[in-house]
């Protein structure tokens, strides 16, 4: 299982709307394994395919908080569709593997129900609350070209985007020198 490179802000692919998965096959299952390995290595709890540059409606999540292989409880979610969101809301301090080292409080519905296909292509539904609900919404947002910084004030969002554009420019300058 090769680890994949993470796409980070300001890469415009993060704003693309991902396309539905047409067929669940061995290649897609291998992609799911690569995504899980990448997510665990980066110490994340969720990863959308678009975050590794693949615009497919697919994500992986593991909010178990266990670092040991025997304790992991990964979810592979293909073509997710939110069926219901609660009126009750939660606030979590969110971060993102595509926006490293930046965190902000985001308010989202506390509970939701999602229909999806699992890694074998079987239709499933999950009802989630609290951290899992927040993580599902965060990752599904990626599939629709939205980032968690879209939920913070415009001033803060613009500041974050400028910071990451500057960081990318400095990185490109350093690479050109080498």
UniProtKB/Swiss-Prot annotation:
The active site is at 139. It comes from the Bacteria. It catalyses: N-terminal N-formyl-L-methionyl-[peptide] + H2O = N-terminal L-methionyl-[peptide] + formate. Binds 1 Fe(2+) ion. GO terms for molecular function: metal ion binding; peptide deformylase activity. PANTHER family: PEPTIDE DEFORMYLASE. Belongs to the polypeptide deformylase family. This is Peptide deformylase. The lineage of its organism: Bacteria, Pseudomonadati, Pseudomonadota, Alphaproteobacteria, Hyphomicrobiales.
């Amino acid at each position: 299982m090769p680890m994949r490179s993470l796409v980070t802000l300001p890469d415009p692919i993060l704003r693309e709307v991902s396309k539905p998965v047409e067929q669940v096959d061995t290649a897609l299952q291998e992609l799911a394994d690569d995504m899980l390995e990448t997510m665990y290595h980066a110490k994340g709890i969720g990863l959308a395919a678009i975050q590794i540059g693949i615009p497919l409606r697919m994500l992986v999540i593991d909010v178990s908080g266990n670092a040991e292989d025997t304790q992991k409880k990964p979810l592979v979610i293909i073509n997710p569709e939110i069926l219901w969101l609660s009126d009750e809301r939660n606030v979590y301090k969110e971060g993102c593997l595509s926006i490293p080292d930046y965190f902000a409080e985001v308010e989202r519905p506390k509970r939701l129900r999602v229909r999806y296909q699992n890694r074998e292509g079987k239709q499933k539904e999950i009802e989630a609350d609290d951290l899992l609900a927040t993580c599902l919404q965060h990752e599904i947002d990626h599939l629709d070209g939205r980032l968690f910084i879209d939920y913070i004030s415009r001033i803060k969002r613009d500041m974050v985007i400028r910071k990451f554009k500057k960081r990318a420019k400095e990185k490109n300058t350093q690479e050109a020198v080498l």
